[in-house]
Amino acid sequence: MATVKLTNVKKIYGKDTVAVQDFNLDIADKEFIVFVGPSGCGKSTTLRMIAGLEDISSGTVEIDGVVVNDLQPRDRNIAMVFQNYALYPHLTVFENMAFSLRLKKVPQDEVYERVTAAAEILGITEFLTRKPRALSGGQRQRVAIGRAMVRDSKVFLMDEPLSNLDAKLRNQMRAEIILLRQKIDTTFIYVTHDQTEAMTLGDRIVIMKDGFIQQVGTPTEVFDMPVNMFVAEFIGAPKMNTFKTNLVREGDKYFVTPYGAKIEVTGKKAEMLLAKNVQSQEIILGVRPEHVTQADAQDAAAIPCTIKVNEMMGSELHLHVVEENGDQLIVRIPTITLEDEQRKEMVYGHKLYITFEGKVMHFFNPETGVNLLA
């Protein structure tokens, strides 16, 4: 299989429109890497430069130690799956999957062997004689993936392959891609704007914004220790609550004081603040909705709030609450933790008291947005 290395890669359109800037990344053999970010961040452009579909303005792309900047896409030994299936409507599934092999004049026996093997892995053997119009969206996407698989390429590139599918089918195909990766054991580079896809599929995630890499890490690393506010708010759903408050040091202990409450920082976060000798200062505090809990009114750590919106998600409630100064927060509560009477109370206008779990809070510089502990 193959390693992929990008060194100081830059892409400029026209004279001064910078799409990708200073992109440096080493991708290990058989790694599943995901580029994720909002529209226009440069993720698809980067993938297309790896594929050879976009020229590189500066820097180098290497596949298996060979610089491929000047190689045509067909000479890079890569396979690519696009957002659009791009199947030939007049050809059967078998013929679509075999098309590139026949162009290369691969022997017919080998064509049959490769296509049927890929079809079996993807669960589309029974559709090999059908034409694309007789297939569902998910089945067509499997055919597109199979067409790439039969090429037996070193690197598998996937550009938002699930974005045309409905939510249910997207979830199903996401699971199938995870299983596919385990079966074919090759290097994957996958592009998506969906952080759920990124978190569930990737060995590592590359989070991009405005052409720059913001953070590279495992799903756990980027979720637990986002390097800045952009990553913190982009990764995780519902998104992280962020607001200005003060971090207060009292001896070897740290507290945050949002909305008049006093909440102690505990666990590893407290140890890290102490090790860095962080002093009292104004910060932007980040708290994920699942780390907001209900509190007793008399507790010094309690923050009074009023429910404005209750989103019933089935296994959990997403409460949009407003504290007394007008700031809005999201609270995520598993429904299994609530009694029937408590559920009935969670309606517009209901007052409740919340607090934050002290061991999982995040602290950002209010001017730069950088995580104080990253």
Question: Where are the regions that the model predicts?
Answer:
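Helix-to-loop junction immediately C-terminal to a conserved catalytic motif
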Residues: A51
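Pre-Walker A (P-loop) beta-loop-beta motif of ABC nucleotide-binding domains
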Residues: F23-V34
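Non-catalytic connector elements of ABC transporters
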Residues: R249-A374
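Conserved ABC transporter NBD signature motif
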Residues: G59-V67
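The feature captures the beta-strand-to-loop junction immediately N-terminal to the Walker
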Residues: V36-P38
